[in-house]
Each structure stands twice: as structure tokens, then as C-alpha cells.
Amino acid sequence: MASVSLTRVIEKMKLENLTPEIDVKHVKITQPDINRPALQLAGYFEHFDATRLQIIGFVEYTYMEGLTDETRREAYEKLMAYDIPCIVFSRDLKPDPIFLETAIRHEVPVLSTKKSTSDFMSEIIRWLNVKLAPCISVHGVLV
């Protein structure tokens, strides 16, 4: 299965690593699709594809801000119990300390971009589709 290293994604997309204590060298992105985990933060995990890169935009961010610390901790624990390749905060939004603490404990890299959610999503999807596209080699002989 084709994959792209998270290190390459960080370099190409100019992402800031908010969890440098997590070794990202061995993390692979294998899915060109992404997910905005709004429903998962609200507790709905049916049909959740944890292999996708997760993006937190302004809507998810403001939802999380409105939760109590206890509810936040519970939502983060449920989300990060899955084997997520990484979570990217858009618009230069910064996660709260509970989020970072949970991510570090579950070894889920947390990244940040200054780009708007829509701009980042379209750029990363386009780039991942090219990098993860099926590829075949055909050997031929000219006579």
C-alpha cells in the first residue's frame, strides 16, 4: 500500500509540530481523504475512519472551548484512543493543555497550519491524491 511519511507532509505543508516529544519519523499517511472530527468530539464514532488525517477547524475549536474540562477530557480520550496518524489545527489555532496532554499520552502528533481550514483541506487532499495514486510499471520490448 502506498504511503507518505508524516515528516514529508510536515515539510511540504509547512506545518508546525506542537508535540515535538512524539517521534513522527515512523508515522505514515496511507489515506488521501481527511476527516473533521466534529461528530467524534460530540461522541459519535460509527463509520469513523481513524486512518485519515484529522483536521480541527474553527467550528470544532469553538465547540471544544464550550465544553467543561471534564467533558473535554472524556471527548479527547475517546478520539485519541484510535490509532490516528495526526491531528492538524488550522487558522493557527492552538489546542488547549488538556488536548496536548491527551495527545502526548496517546502518541498522536498534533500539528498546526496558518492556512484557513478550506485552503488547507483542498491543498492536502490534492497533494495526497497525487502521492498516494495507484502506480503500475509495465515492461515492454521494442522489436
Give the ranges of each region predicted by the language model.
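Short, flexible, solvent-exposed loop/turn segments with mixed acidic/basic and small polar residues
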Residues: 74-79, 99-102, 141
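Residue-level preference for the first positions of well-ordered beta-strands
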Residues: 52, 86, 140-142
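Gly/Thr-rich phosphate-binding loop signature of adenosyl cofactor/nucleotide-binding cores
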Residues: 1-80
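Charged, amphipathic alpha-helical linker segments immediately N-terminal to NTP-binding catalytic cores
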Residues: 83-86, 92-127
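Glycine-rich adenosyl-nucleotide cofactor-binding module
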Residues: 122-143
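Short, contiguous strand/loop micro-motifs
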Residues: 62-63, 85-87
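Conserved beta-strand segments of the P-loop GTPase G domain that flank and frequently precede/overlap
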Residues: 56-58, 87-90
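Short secondary-structure boundary/capping elements
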Residues: 67-71, 95, 135
